[in-house]
UniProtKB/Swiss-Prot annotation:
Name the record gives this protein: Shugoshin
Keywords annotated in UniProt: Cell cycle, Cell division, Centromere, Chromosome, Chromosome partition, Coiled coil, Nucleus
Cellular compartments annotated: Nucleus; Chromosome, Centromere; Chromosome
Annotated S-S bridges: none
Organism expressing this protein natively: Caenorhabditis elegans
Organism domain of life: Eukaryota
One annotated GO biological process: chromosome segregation
Stretches with biased composition (Low complexity): 167-178
Tissues of expression: Expressed in gonads.
Gene (name only): sgo-1
Biased segments, Basic residues type: 184-193
Phenotype seen when the gene is deleted: Viable with 100% of viable progeny. Defects in the regulation of the synapsis checkpoint and DNA damage response in meiosis with an increased rate of synaptonemal complex disassembly in late pachytene meiotic nuclei and an increased number of rad-51 positive and hus-1 positive nuclei in meiotic prophase. Reduces the number of apoptotic nuclei in the syp-1 mutant background, which is indicative of inactivation of the synapsis checkpoint or the DNA damage response. RNAi-mediated knockdown results in chromosome segregation defects during meiosis and mitosis.
Length: 309
């Protein structure tokens, strides 16, 4: 029996429908980027290996040097040990000082740069205006004849008066010198004479000066002394008061002696009472005309008793 006949007899076999399955996308690996990252890691590891080998060699060399120093310290004497220790410490100190010096130089350079920046900030900004002086313009003006210098009339008169006064004074001195003997007077150191001679010489000199000062002049000389006020009239006679005595007699009479004995009264001298004693207010008795004061708390002999309860 063929398949076709069987299919026609029994009917067609229904085929099961397959569900569409979700296809999982395969991961796309970028082999180039992965290889680059692995190559970089490999290079870093190689560099670390090289550094580690260098440090290992350095530590080995230091270990050998320390063993040698230790052996020298063990084998050497006390003085050699001290010298080695001092030398080692000096090396450490010098290395430390070199590091400090390098840091100090760096700090100085940095502060210098900062100060330069501050000074540049503080400097005034150049203004856009032109600070140069403008060129001087030459003025072609006509020449004018100037007026000659003239002094004021008042100043000229004062100068002439001063000159005239100087001439007059010189003439007066020359006339004084020639008036006595017709010859110039010489200054001589003369000793002190009597008062009468001094007064006579003074009067003669004053008369000669008055005669010499009466020389006629064309112009009035300047006034060297301020004009005094006008003289007042004759003063009226005033009646003189009688002179007052300097000391007054005391108003209180002297006390009489109290004892009857004449001998005692003659020997005892009683001082008279002062006049100022009567003016002392504390010695005066209170007058009965005024109202008396009410006694206080501390008055004696009867104390103050308050009767108002």
């Amino acid at each position: 029996m063929d398949a076709k006949t069987a299919q026609s007899i029994f009917g067609g076999i229904v085929a099961a429908k397959k569900r569409p399955s979700k296809e999982v996308p395969e991961p796309t690996i970028n082999f180039k980027s992965a290889n680059d990252s692995l190559v970089k890691k490999n290079l870093l590891l190689k560099q670390q290996v090289v550094q580690c080998t260098k440090t290992i060699e350095k530590l080995r060399n230091e270990n050998v040097a320390l063993r040698q120093k230790n052996q020298e310290l063990i084998d050497g004497t006390l003085e050699q040990r001290i010298e080695l220790i001092v030398e080692q410490r000096l090396k450490f100190r010098l290395a430390h000082a070199a590091v400090l010096h390098k840091k100090l130089v760096q700090n100085i350079q940095q502060t210098g740069l900062e100060l330069d920046g501050l000074f540049k900030d503080l400097e005034p900004e150049p203004s856009g205006l032109n600070t140069r002086r403008p060129p001087k313009l030459e003025l072609n003006l006509e020449r004018v004849d100037e007026i000659p210098f003239c002094q004021s009339s008042m100043q000229g008169e004062i100068d002439e008066n001063e000159i005239r006064f100087d001439n007059n004074s010189s003439q007066s001195t020359s006339s004084i010198q020639n008036a006595v003997n017709g010859t110039p007077r010489k200054k001589q150191s003369v000793g002190k004479g009597r008062r009468s001679e001094l007064f006579q010489s003074f009067n003669a000199d004053s008369s000669i000066v008055e005669e010499a000062s009466t020389i006629p002049t064309n112009r009035r000389a300047p006034m060297l002394i301020a004009p005094s006020s006008t003289p007042a009239g004759p003063s009226k006679p005033t009646a003189r008061k009688p002179p007052t005595p300097r000391f007054k007699k005391p108003s209180t009479p002297a006390l009489a002696p109290q004892s009857d004995d004449t001998e005692l009264s003659s020997t005892i001298q009683v001082r008279r009472q002062r006049s100022a004693k009567m003016n002392i207010k504390s010695l005066k008795e209170p007058s009965g005309k005024d109202k008396l004061r009410r006694p206080g708390k501390h008055d004696e002999p009867m104390p103050y008793i308050n009767t108002f309860f």
